[in-house]
């Protein structure tokens, strides 16, 4: 599962680097974090929720996907990732697995280059 989440994060990072300028990236983080942002590598999964939620930034992507659906999936996958990183012992639910694979399918459609 972590490999799929890593692929999703890499695709988000690549899209952010290709479509957004540094100010867009900094605008997606809290004020106390702005100075550490140099490129999309420095964004957390949670920052992508805020980055993609903004209508103007969404438009810059040029993705023909439903913005609300993508943002919802990014937020759900962020939570799955956090659960995994904190060594959750419960098996991954079908809903969580579906969120990860659903986001990855959308990202592969929007940004087909691996």
Question: What kind of feature is each model-predicted range?
Answer:
Residues 1-114:
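Amphipathic alpha-helical interface elements
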């Amino acid at each position: 599962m972590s490999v799929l989440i890593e692929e999703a994060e890499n695709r988000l990072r690549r899209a952010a680097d290709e479509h957004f300028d540094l100010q867009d990236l900094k605008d997606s983080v809290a004020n106390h974090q702005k100075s550490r942002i140099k490129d999309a590598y420095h964004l957390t999964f949670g920052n992508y929720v805020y980055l993609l939620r903004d209508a103007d930034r969404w438009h810059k992507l040029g993705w023909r996907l439903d913005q609300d659906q993508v943002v919802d999936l990014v937020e759900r996958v962020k939570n799955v990732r956090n659960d995994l990183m904190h060594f959750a012992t419960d098996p991954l639910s079908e809903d969580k697995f579906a969120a990860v694979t659903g986001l990855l399918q959308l990202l592969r459609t929007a940004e087909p280059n691996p």
